[in-house]
């Protein structure tokens, strides 16, 4: 049952963050240390979406490539837009639909600010 749901969740994450591809970001998908990682990269930043066993998280990297010049959790990039208490609770919920929706909405509404943070 667990393995049947995982591809559905993977597709759902891709659908919710598809607006990044429309903005010219390139998607790379891979596993690292037991975590699923969706990496959306552009010339200005790299948005990594971690779908990990402990939950769900979004990290923004700035610079020309690995190692990045700056790497910040989305809560540091958008402190006034994210209620940390709600975000912490949602991150620990193993990425249910509401968590994915929450972060997709935050990123889509604030993409300009994210791209020009540093």
Label the model's feature ranges.
Residues 1-19, 27-118:
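Intrinsically disordered, low-complexity regulatory regions enriched in serine/threonine/proline
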């Amino acid at each position: 049952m667990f393995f049947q749901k995982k591809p559905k969740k993977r597709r759902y994450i891709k659908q919710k963050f598809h607006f990044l591809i429309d903005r010219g970001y390139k998607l790379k998908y891979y596993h690292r240390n037991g975590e699923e990682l969706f990496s959306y990269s552009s010339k200005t930043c790299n948005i990594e979406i971690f779908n990990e066993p402990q939950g769900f998280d979004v990290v923004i990297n700035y610079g020309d490539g690995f190692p990045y010049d700056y790497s910040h959790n989305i809560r540091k990039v958008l402190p006034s837009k994210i209620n940390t208490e709600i975000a912490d609770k949602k991150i620990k919920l193993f990425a249910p639909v509401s968590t994915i929706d929450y972060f997709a909405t935050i990123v889509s509404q604030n993409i300009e600010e994210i791209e020009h943070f540093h």
